[in-house]
A protein has these predicted regions:
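N-terminal, positively charged/glycine-rich alpha-helical extensions of SAM-dependent methyltransferases
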Residues: 1-18
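A short SAM/SAH-binding and catalytic strip from SAM-dependent methyltransferases
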Residues: 114-127
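Conserved class I S-adenosyl-L-methionine
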Residues: 141-174
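A short acidic, Gly/Pro-enriched loop at the edge of an enzyme's catalytic core
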Residues: 104-115
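Conserved alpha-helix/loop element of class I SAM-dependent methyltransferases that forms part
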Residues: 21-48, 59-63
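Short alpha-helix
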Residues: 169-189
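Class I SAM-dependent methyltransferase SAM/SAH-binding core
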Residues: 44-105
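A short glycine-rich, Lys/Arg-flanked "PGG" loop and its adjoining helix->strand segment in the class I
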Residues: 129-144
Length: 189
């Protein structure tokens, strides 16, 4: 299970060439996050966990840091977190890095962040619903969770042709955004 995914994320901690698809996705994500910042007055950001879909781990909140937000990044893998801290150092951007493994109990008080968010990591967690409830608890304004569209051609290619083992280490039912929304609403969002 972990070996395939481990190889993928480790590669991008030193090879920043994500390919055109991921670069385009990052531009769209950055625009979306900056629009959220503007619309909701976001100044403090929590991204937990920092590992989600392919590409360079831990850089999803870079645009927010560049726009002056205080960013906190949480991950359960100490080696990955250290590498992400190095990457942020290369970018000369400040951030707070927290090693924490209990996604059902984040080490922050209620309403600690303007934005608590996650980029496609739910299906790697043993209890995704617990993390979603925690994101609601620690956010005072906005919770944003993105998951891949299971009907999108790239996803289907990955699942059935390019990386058939993917479903062995990813819990696909958490890519159902309706399911995610129901948990968030049940937590009071």
């Amino acid at each position: 299970m972990e070996s395939t995914e481990k190889q993928t994320w480790q590669r991008y901690l030193t090879d920043y060439n994500e390919g055109l698809g991921l670069v385009y996705e990052r531009f769209v994500l950055n625009d979306f996050l900056l629009a959220l910042k503007s619309r909701h007055g976001i100044q403090t950001v929590l991204e937990a966990p920092l590992f989600g879909m392919a590409g360079v781990s831990g850089i999803n909140s870079v645009a927010l840091a560049q726009a002056g937000c205080s960013v906190t990044l949480v991950d359960d893998h100490a080696g990955r977190l250290a590498a992400v801290e190095r990457i942020w150092g290369e970018l000369d951007l400040p951030a707070r890095f927290v090693h924490h493994a209990d996604w059902g109990q984040l080490p922050f008080p209620d309403d600690a962040f303007d934005l608590a968010w996650n980029w496609a990591a739910l299906w790697y967690l043993s209890d995704p619903a617990a993390l979603l409830r925690e994101l609601v608890r620690v956010s005072r304004r906005v919770v944003f969770v993105a998951m891949p569209n299971r009907a999108q051609a790239g996803y289907l290619l990955r699942k059935y042709l390019l990386e058939r083992d993917f479903v062995k280490y990813a819990e696909e039912r958490w890519a159902d955004i309706g399911r995610v929304r129901r948990v968030l609403e049940g937590a009071g969002l």
